[in-house]
Structure formats: structure tokens, C-alpha cells
Amino acid sequence: MPIPVDTAQSISKKRKRKHGGNARKEEAAAPAATEAVIESPEKEEVTVEKKKAKKEKSKKQKVEHMSSDEEQKNTEESEQEASDNEEEKSDAEETPAANGEDLPSADTIRLPQQDGDPVKFTELGLSEKTMKGIEGMGFETMTEVQRRTIPPLLAGRDVLGAAKTGSGKTLSFLIPAIEMLSALRFKPRNGTGAIIVSPTRELALQIFGQVRELLAHHSQTYGIVIGGANRRAEAEKLMKGVNLLVATPGRLLDHLQNTQGFVFKNLRTLIIDEADRILEVGFEDEMRQIAKILPSENRQTMLFSATQTTKVEDLARISLRPGPLYINVDHRKEHSTVEGLEQGYVICEADKRFLLLFSFLKRNLKKKIIVFLSSCNSVKYYGELLNYIDLPVLDLHGKQKQQKRTNTFFEFCNAKQGTLICTDVAARGLDIPAVDWIIQFDPPDDPRDYIHRVGRTARGSNGKGRSLMFLQPSEVGFLKHLKEARVPVVEFDFPTQKIVNVQSQLEKLIGQNYYLNKSAKEGYRSYLQAYASHSLRSVFDVHKLDLVKVSKGFGFSTPPRIDIQLGSSLKDKPPQGRRNYGSQPGSKFKRKHNDD
């Protein structure tokens, strides 16, 4: 429901009601002051000096009158604020009821209207408790997406926003949602007033962390429901009352359908973050059901997406009210990636890929680096291999248990240096501080995936970072697709003499170590399956791969025998986009993230 904004007239009426007789006395006194300034023109004999003296006197009276009014107003406002605080405190002490309680109408809420785009958070007229949370997070100045989205969201508009990753959009939707909960004085017994839907567990956890910081000084409750977590514990918390809920689509739908005592009839705000990614990973049906179950009356919806697709537009139609505000902060930019990002590629034969990666990581031990691979088994193998040869790395992929993924993610976030090897599970939305390098060891599925991968570095308004993509000679056609997507890349040159040649030692190790050999075979098999499911098959043709060279990149002297078919059936199969974990592939050759 749109939250109306105060006009000058409504503010005046409120002031009359608030101050009662005092306000009327002030209005009655105002004409007298005006009359004192304007002298009758009929008295022509009054000298110029007298007129000047009278004007000076009247001005002085007017200033004194205004200052006394301000003092009186400030006194009354402080008294009113004190009574409001006492009332809020007594409300917070009430015990929550399990069956949920209707909220009073939101029609009385008034939020400040801004003249022009504000620059600092202090200009938004936010509540003192929210401002304390923002200051505690160390923010003062807003990013462009925050300047353009927060004011209309505070005014109750539905918003469809397009912004690059790293633009600061998380605060753009959290601040209005929290202000709404605070203004309506949500309590546990009122149930859930705001829901944030996120495509991945890691992104949901990150949003939840920012929610915790922003709500540190508020009395409203908050919680998170994600796949892989304890469902019973989540249900118990929902029944007690969670005012702001962060969720992944599958688990949210589960609770909406099956958790009795989950009160969401008072929902006022629905936020869909990374909508394109939610749909890409196979949650289209879940989102349609969620939109149908949640109450739409009096609901404000915010939908954010880095890219605009037909499916995103369809989701917007069923979830947003007619006439939403569309905000695109990227259309005026020359490039699709953030400024401050130096992007390059290196052309490298398949048998030299690991040697180059190993040499690069060895030379940059003091840097913070993320390496993207195409499958879970590849991540698992290279993580085990590098740690075994004393090059410490962390690994993150969809086959890990949720607790392991969470621990790894936060360990890397808090580290000042180190390497994280991961699948695209970490490529969307996650805000990992101070990443120096993004290494795309396995090429992305398309330019959109490239943009989201490199979005992990150079984040924020003044962020700096570098990106390096490995390409085989047969894959240089991908550069044309990047150029069409307005992605500026230049070729990086790595002198051959600086590449550490450990191929013979690697092959010997893989030949002798049973567990590494088994892991290498699984990684090799998954790499080929992922390559075969590329959507850009004109560029990434699995039949053009030199399997001898590819196998050397996994530590084999000759290609191992593996159970896989890459026959002619793929030639006739229409291109299929990559699917991520959480989806249900229906074909024999599943998805590029076959084991995500």
C-alpha cells in the first residue's frame, strides 16, 4: 500500500491539532506583526526617518516573535517525543500472541518528502534508530542507486530496479522496509511485515547480516529461512513472530504452505532480490506460487534485477501493482561493468592452464583472489590439490553442507588475503570485501555470467580491482560477445619463462595418490560435461577440445577412462542455458553446473 507523503497543508492541519490553542494564538498574532510592518500611506507628513525607525522596530518585533514561537514549538515537540517514547516502550513490553493481531491502518503514516535527490542518509529524514544503525555500519553518503530508489520507496511506490552488482542496492530496499516496520510499530504478535526473497543461501545470509546491523536499535524481530537449515527451528521462530524475514524461494514456499502459526496476513513489503537469478536457477514456479499466496492488498513490492529478461518482466507483472516506478542506473553508463575494474584475458593452451594458475597464485600470496570454475567436482579437486602441495586455498560449491558453506564464506570475507575457489554459487550478489583479483579459470556461460563474476571486485563507489579470464585459442570468439555486451577487456601477457613448470611432478603425484587420482577423474569428467552444456556452442564446442591437453591440466599424462558420452546427440540438441543448484534438470546431460 502506498504510504502517503505530507503536504504543506496536511502538516499545517496536524500542527493545529497537535498544539491546540497555542497554534490558534500564533495564527492570530501573525497578522498583527504584519500590520506593524505595513504603515498606512495616508500619513504623508511622517518623515522618511520615522518610517525607517518604525520598520526597524517592526522587524525586531517580528524576529523576537518568531524566536519565541520556535522555542515554544521545540518545547512542545520534545514533550510529544518523550510521550511517544514512553508509549513505544510500554508497547514493546506486551507479550506476543500466537494467532497474530491485525495492525492499525497505515494511512496515518507520513514520511518526509525530499526536494531533489538527497546525497547523504541524514537528508532522508529517517528515524533516529535507523540512522544509528547506518552510522554503525560506517555509511554516510549514498550511492546512485540509493539516491534514486530510497525516496520513492519511503513514499510507498512499487519499484522495478536495474542495477549492477556492487551498487549498494541492498541498503536501498532494507532501509524503506525497516522504516515501514518501525512506523507501524510491528510487534511479534503482528507476524511478518516484510519478506526478502534471495536466490542463494549465501546471499540470504549476507542480507541477514545487514538486517541485523540496521535493526540493532529497533525492537522489531527478524529471522532467516533457507534450504539446508533446521526446518523445525525455523518454524518455531516463525510461530513466535518474525517481523522481517529473509528467505530462499523453496524454503519460503514450504513454510507458507505447511507451517501453522506462520502469520503473514499483515505483510506490507515484499522484496525480490536478484530476480533474474532466482528465475535462472529454476524457481519460476515457486515464485508464482509465493506471489499468489502472499496478500497483495496494502503491499508494496520491490523487485531488483541486474538484467531485464522476459521472465523478469512476467514476474514483475504478477507481483507489482500497476504503474511501478522503473529505475535503471546503468543505461547511461558506457560500460556494463563497474568503473575502477581493470579487465583482461590470457590465451592459453589447455595443457598450460593449471601451470599458469599455479604460478599466478604463487606470485600473489598476499592478495585476495577468487577463482571461478564450472563444476563442483573441479572445485573439489583443485582445492584438494593446491592444499596438498602447500598452496592454501578455500573452496565453496553447492555439494557442501550448508554449515560448511557458511563457515567458508565468512572465513574468506574476514580474511585480508587468500584464495577462494568456487563455482558460480558465489557469483551473484555476495559482497566480499576487498577482493583484488577475479580469475575466471573456466570461461563463463555468457556475458551476463561474466559481468556477475567480475562484480565480486571493485565494489562500492570507489572500488578498485582486476579480472583475468583464461581462454583457449578455440574460445577467442567469446571476446566478440563481450564487446557486444559493452565489456572492455584487454589481453594480458604472461612471459613463458615466469610460468613454473611442475607438470612432471603433478603427473607423478596424481599417478601415485589414489584419492587425488579419483578426485582428478571426477573433476575432468565434470569439466567435459559442463563444457558440453555451454549455451554458446558456436564458441565453446566440446568436439574441438584436445582431450590430451585437457587431461594434462588435471594432472594426467594421457586422458583417463571415464564414464561419459559426448556423442552426436549433443549436436542436434538445442542450446540450453546453465542451471544452478536447486533446479531439477530433466536431460541426460544435466547442466553446466552438473553437480552444483
UniProtKB/Swiss-Prot annotation:
It catalyses: ATP + H2O = ADP + phosphate + H(+). It is an enzyme of class 3 (hydrolase). A motif (DEAD box) lies at residues 273-276. Residues 40-50, 61-76 have a biased composition (Basic and acidic residues). A motif (Q motif) lies at residues 119-147. Its EC number is 3.6.4.13. Residues 1-119, 565-596 are annotated as: Disordered. Residues 77-94 have a biased composition (Acidic residues). The keyword tRNA processing does not apply. The Q motif is unique to and characteristic of the DEAD box family of RNA helicases and controls ATP binding and hydrolysis. Belongs to the DEAD box helicase family. DDX18/HAS1 subfamily. Associates in the nucleolus with the 60S and pre-60S ribosomal subunits. This is ATP-dependent RNA helicase has1.
